[in-house]
């Protein structure tokens, strides 16, 4: 990812994989995602999916609209999850993602992708989840999560339960240190 300067998105279970300020991190996808992450998926010409079953929470209910113009490559150990009648997969590689990444780690892809990378980062900067213009007389979950993100220490762990707090935290928690972790039920 870093070697090839590839824009990346994550699912809600991958929230803590990238630091918020990582140059290649665009956002989160799905109904618990953000605009930038979803725009990146919907405008991609190639989606490389690593270890995800592409569930409804990631793709939405209209499977044929997910990555509608993209070639979709899935690398996953569980082939049965991808034999369901859901998202169109153009190429499936049935292997462990860790093994796959070890094999391709030093491969360099052809350039240029600068325009695409800039477009993705523009979406990320233009449409953050936390807008900062909430009524200060009431508690707002997005404002709370943003403040919590700013106050978390380097080795902090955040756990959210189900319901609205899960949606808001999964969507708006900012990971600012590599050792921060996020778990949900």
Describe these PLM feature segments.
Residues 1, 121-185:
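Active-site diphosphate/adenylate-binding microenvironment
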Residues 1-5, 62-67, 88-91, 172-178:
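Short, solvent-exposed amphipathic alpha-helical segments in soluble enzyme
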Residues 1-11, 46, 154-157:
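Catalytic alpha/large subunits of respiratory electron-transfer oxidoreductases
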Residues 5, 88-95, 132-139:
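Short, exposed beta-strand "edge-strand" segments with a Pro/Gly-rich flavor and a Y/T-containing core
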Residues 7-9, 49, 73, 159, ...:
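Structural detector of well-ordered beta-strand residues that form the stable sheet scaffold
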Residues 11, 94-95, 161, 185:
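Conserved beta-strand termini and adjacent loop/short-helix elements that scaffold enzyme active sites
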Residues 12, 116, 137-140:
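A diffuse structural propensity rather than consistent per-protein peaks
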Residues 14-119:
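Glycine-rich, acidic loop regions that bind phosphate or pyrophosphate groups
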